Amino acid sequence: MQLSVLIASVLAAGAAVDAASYTPQNVSCPDNANFIRNAADGLSPAEKEWLKKRDPITRDALQTFLRRAFANVSTEITSALFNDTENVPKLGIAVAGGGYRAMFVGAGAFAAMDNRTDGANEHGLGGLLQAATYMAGLSGGNWLTGTLAYNNFTSVQQILEEGDKADAIWNITNSFLNPYDKDFSKTLARWTAIGSQVQGKRDAGFNVTITDLWSRALAYGWFPTLPNAGAGLTWSSLRDNEIFMNGEMPMPISVADGRYPGTTVINLNATVFEMTPFEIGSWDPSLNAFSDIKYLGTQVTDGKPETERCINGFDDASFIMGTSSSLFNEFTMSNDSAVAYTYLNTLSSTLVKGIDKENNDIAMYAPNPFKGSKYVDSNYTTSIVDSDSLFLVDGGEDLQGIPFVPLLKQERDLDIIFAIDVDTETSDNYPAGGPMMKTYERQFSKQGKGMAFPYVPDMTTFVNLGLGGKPSFYGCDANNLTDLEYIPPLIVYIPNSYHSFESNVSTFKLNYNYSERVGMIRNAFEATTRNNLTEDADYVTCVGCAIIRRKQQSLNLTLPDICDKCFTNYCWNGTIDNTPTKLLTPNNQDPAAISSAIAAVTDDSPIGALLNTGSGTKSNSSSKTNSTLVTSSRATSTGTLISNSSSNSTVSSTAARSSTSSTAKKNAGSVLKLEFSKSASVMVAIAAAAVASLI
C-alpha cells in the first residue's frame, strides 16, 4: 500500500516534467529552402566560413607548441612554415569508442594536449588541443567530445575540479540505470522524467526507439547543470555559441554508421555518417550528400520541404551523442543476447507508449532527410534515399572503431591525425590496431572512393612488435604512399595502455567512483605523454617532427637532425611478424556476457527487495556497487594528473598485460554480472512500477 502511494505521487510529479523540451517544434521554413547539397562540392559554405576564424587561432597555438618542441634544436623550418599561411600544418584528433572507458581514456589524452591542464605544458603535449581544427568521436569517444563542446568547451581539468558534487559533469558513481542508489523515489522520478521527455517527441508524431531513452538517460551525466539535463539543447545550437562562432575550439564531429533498410548486418560497406554543427551526411558514394542538421525532422523530397512548415529541435545534442553509441541492434543478431533485447524492448515499451517496435533497436531519423536525393553514385543502391526513414547505429559497428573517415577527406586538408585507440582486442582488453587496419582496408572497397589511409600492420604483427605499449607513427614517408589515391595525413597512434591504473575495464561497466575516474584519466595522460616525458625526454620534439613532416616533404625543406632519430623510434618501418600469439584472442565482452548478467537479476538492490522481484542467484551482500573490472593499488582520490613520482608508476604495457591478464579475465565475469544484476533489478522495478500505474 505504501509503495503504491509512493509510485502514484512520483508519477504525478513526473507528469509535470516539460516534455516539450525534447520535442521537435514547428517553425517557418527559410525562403527557397533546399537543405541537401552534393558532397562532391566539397566543404559546406558554413564550414569554410568557420575555418576563416579557426585557422588563425590554430596557427598561433601550433606555432607556440612547435617553439617549445624545438626549443633546444637549431632549425629554421618553423619560420619557413609560418611565413606563409598556406604552409602551416593542420591537425585533427580522433577518439575511439568503448563506452565510459573510451570517454575517460580520451579525457586523459585531451588533458595531456590541453594547455589549460596543470602540468600539460611542462610534462605533456599542452597546446595541441588548441591547435586542432577538428575533434571527431564515435560512441564513448563522442561522449567526450560532445560533453566538452556543449559545456562551453570546458576542460577536463575543470571537470575534475568539481570532484564528486551531485551536479558534477561525469559524476557516475551510480550508473544511469540506478542514479540514486537506494533512493527509490528519486530513481523512479528520473526515469519517469525521461519517459515523459521521449513521450513528448512521440506524441508530436515522431518515431522514437530505445536510442531516445538511452540518449536522455546518459545526458544526466553529460549536462547535469542544465534543465532536464539539456533536453532541447541542439547539436546545431553550437553555431550560436560565441566560443565556437569565434573559432576558439575545434569543430566536433560525431560519427555513426548507416543501416540499409531491411537489413541487420553492419560491415565495412556501411555508409559512414558524420554530424557537425552544420550538417549531417556522408562522403561515401552510397549517399554522397549532406543536409542542414538544424532542420532534421522536416518532411522533404530531394532536400525541398513538402510544406511551408519546417522542424527545429530534432537534432537534440544527447540524441546525436546517443546515436553514435546505439549498439542495441547487435543484441538482435545472436540467440545469446535475446534475453537482453527482450528486456530492453519491454522496458522501452513500458516507459513510452507508441514506441517503434519494428525498428526499436536503432536510432531512427524520420522523416528521412535524404529522401529522394539524386546524389547517390550510379554504381550503388538507392535504398537509403528511397526509404521514408534513415536508420543509424553505433559508429564502430563496421569495426572502424576510430573515427578516421571524416578527417581523411582531402577537402579538410589535414597533415596529421592524433588517434586515441581504446578498443579491447587482446585477451586482456587492450588495443591491437584493428580499427586502423579496417580503415586501411576500406580505402580499397567501393565505399573507399576518394579516400586514402597509410599502410599499417596486421593485428598479429601489431602485438608481436609491442606497438600497443607506446605511441607510434604511421605514414611517416610520403614517398612510400604514392600508390594511394592521394597522400593521407600522418597518423600518431596513441593506444590505451597501462601505466598507473588498469584501464582495461569492460565496456559494460556503467559506474565509476571519483578515484576510478581520476585513475583512468591520469593513466591516459601518462600513456599520451610517455609517462609525463620520463620515458623519453625528446617525445615532444618527436611529436613536433611528426606534425611538420608532410609540409616538410612537400616543400622540400630540411628537417632537424633529431627527427631522424624520432622517426626511427616511433615510425612503423613495414616490419611484419605473423608469429601466432596467445595474447591476440577474443575477449569476454560479448553479448552472451550481457545476457547471462541480466538473466542473473537478484533482489539484492533495495528496489528489487521492495517489489519482491528477486530471481536468479543472490549476489554477495558485501559486494560494493562501485566495483571495477580490475582494481589498482595506485588509484588515487585526488584530481591531480601529474604523479608526484613518475618513475614509481612507470610500467611497460607488455609487462602489465602479462601480470594483469589473468586477473582481468578472472574478475570480468563476476564484476559484469554484479553490475548488471543490480542495474537490472532497478530497471525491472521501474518497469513494474510503470505497468502498475497503468492498471
Swiss-Prot record:
Reactions performed catalytically: a 1-acyl-sn-glycero-3-phosphocholine + H2O = sn-glycerol 3-phosphocholine + a fatty acid + H(+)
Identification of the protein by name: Lysophospholipase 2
GO biological process: glycerophospholipid catabolic process
PANTHER family: CYTOSOLIC PHOSPHOLIPASE A2 (PTHR10728), LYSOPHOSPHOLIPASE 1-RELATED (PTHR10728:SF33)
Glycosylation sites: 26, 72, 83, 115, 152, 171, 207, 269, 335, 379, 480, 504, 513, 532, 556, 573, 620, 626, 644, 648
InterPro entries listed in its UniProt record: Acyl_Trfase/lysoPLipase, LysoPLipase_cat_dom
Source organism of the structure: Candida glabrata (strain ATCC 2001 / BCRC 20586 / JCM 3761 / NBRC 0622 / NRRL Y-65 / CBS 138) (Yeast)
Gene label: PLB2
Protein family: Belongs to the lysophospholipase family.
UniProtKB keywords: Cell wall, Glycoprotein, Hydrolase, Lipid degradation, Lipid metabolism, Secreted, Signal
GO cellular component annotations of the record: cytosol; endoplasmic reticulum; extracellular region; fungal-type cell wall; plasma membrane
A UniProt-annotated Pfam family: PLA2_B
First-tier enzyme category under EC: hydrolase
Disordered: annotated span: 612-662
Function recorded in the entry: Catalyzes the release of fatty acids from lysophospholipids. Phospholipase B may well contribute to pathogenicity by abetting the fungus in damaging and traversing host cell membranes, processes which likely increase the rapidity of disseminated infection.
Gene3D superfamilies referenced in this protein's UniProt entry, alphabetically: Cytosolic phospholipase A2 catalytic domain
